Regions:
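Substrate-gating cap/lid alpha-helix
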Residues: 256-259, 264-298
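Second-shell loop/turn segments in exported
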Residues: 87-89, 113-117, 235-243, 270-276, ...
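Membrane-embedded segments
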Residues: 88, 92-174
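N-terminal Lys/Arg-rich, disordered targeting/topogenic segments
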Residues: 1-30
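Secreted/periplasmic serine-hydrolase-like ester/acetyl group-modifying domain
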Residues: 155-259
Length: 339
């Protein structure tokens, strides 16, 4: 009888909720909810700081965001622009192509922009952003070839840890950026912040051209004539790879047909002593785009410029950028594509 009474009391205690039992069951739930709440608050605060103070980021990040969020989303062309030219590439293009000087080499009606990105050789993301904003070019100039990668699969995207991380936590580098900003500002925070803003606005006003003076090796912004580094190959020509098949190539062809623009691969720039001079253009270079009527390759792989035209080992200074832009304008004019 006593055993049955004990079992009955136990069953009754299980069926009837009590304060003590509720607290025991709810403890894990409350802990999880508390963690999620605190994590959400921290995320909101850090994201607010990241958004409110964009000029504390490195110059490359500021330029990248400004080109995607401000430049290509604005109205780039007018009805008077008969030839609308967008130039793509990496940081060498960012520092090397001066749109206003390029346009001045032609009759009125040519309008160009520098869409070179720092530390990023991708073509499609910023081209698609420009097209989505209604900025349709007549000519797309590529200073670097497309890659040979196939179309990314869902598994490829899931393996891209860095992209996923930056999507979920865009302020991942905020602590590093704050420390770097304090170190470079010498505690002149307002002046340093305003300087970054002015550099961004200057880049936008110059239609995407940006002198990367923060990486210059000498105060003058020029390298000495005998400058060289161990990785140079002054007697070797390293031809750039121009794949005949790739996802980017297929997308460029699809977009060129849909929007009616031409895609042209043009020469890049190379510092003297870094590599040997590139041979003149020949018919073999056009084999890769032989099946694409709206695409062509003109000029050599690159042009050679003296070290004095470079601010660091790879990026042109303003004088070098003017030289490269002049050569590019001459090549484009001789090709007849803007006639």
């Amino acid at each position: 009888v006593q055993k049955e009474d004990v079992e009955s009391l136990h069953a009754l205690g299980t069926a009837i909720p009590g304060p003590a039992r509720d607290r025991g069951l709810d403890a894990p739930t409350r802990a999880i909810a508390g963690f999620v709440l605190i994590a959400s608050l921290v995320w909101i605060v850090l994201h607010a700081c990241y958004t409110a103070f964009p000029m504390i980021r490195p110059g490359a990040d500021i330029v990248m965001e400004a080109k995607f969020e401000s430049l290509v989303k604005a109205r780039l062309f007018s009805s008077e622009d008969r030839f609308r030219v967008l130039v793509f590439g990496n940081s060498k293009t960012l520092a090397g192509f001066r749109p206003e000087q390029f346009d001045a080499a032609f009759k009125p009606g040519v309008h160009s922009y520098n869409l070179g990105l720092p530390g990023d050789a991708r073509i499609l993301p910023i081209l698609e952003a420009a097209l989505a904003a209604g900025n349709v070019p007549t000519h797309v100039l590529l200073t670097i070839p497309w890659d040979n990668k196939p179309k990314p699969t869902l598994l490829d995207r899931l393996r891209d840890d860095e992209s996923i991380l930056y999507t979920l936590v865009p302020f991942r580098d905020l602590p590093r950026d704050i420390v770097a900003f304090i170190a470079t500002s010498h505690f002149q925070f307002r002046a340093r912040y305003e300087e970054s803003r002015q550099e961004r606005d200057r880049m936008l006003a110059q239609r995407g051209w940006y002198f990367i003076k923060g990486q210059r090796f000498f105060p003058s912004g020029e390298l000495p004539d005998d400058y060289s580094i161990p990785t140079d190959h002054p007697d070797e020509f390293l031809a750039r790879d121009v794949p005949a098949r790739s996802f980017v190539l297929s997308e460029l062809e699809r977009l060129s047909r849909a929007y009616g623009f031409k895609v042209v691969l043009v020469p890049g720039n190379m510092r003297r002593h870094a590599q040997a001079s590139a041979p003149a253009a020949d018919g073999q270079r056009s084999v890769a785009v032989a099946d694409h009527p709206d695409m062509r390759i003109i000029g050599p792989d690159y042009w050679i410029y003296p070290p004095a035209d470079y601010a660091d080992s790879v990026h042109l200074n303003p004088v070098g950028a003017s030289e490269y832009t002049r050569d590019l304008a001459r090549l484009v004019a001789d090709s007849g594509m803007l006639n």
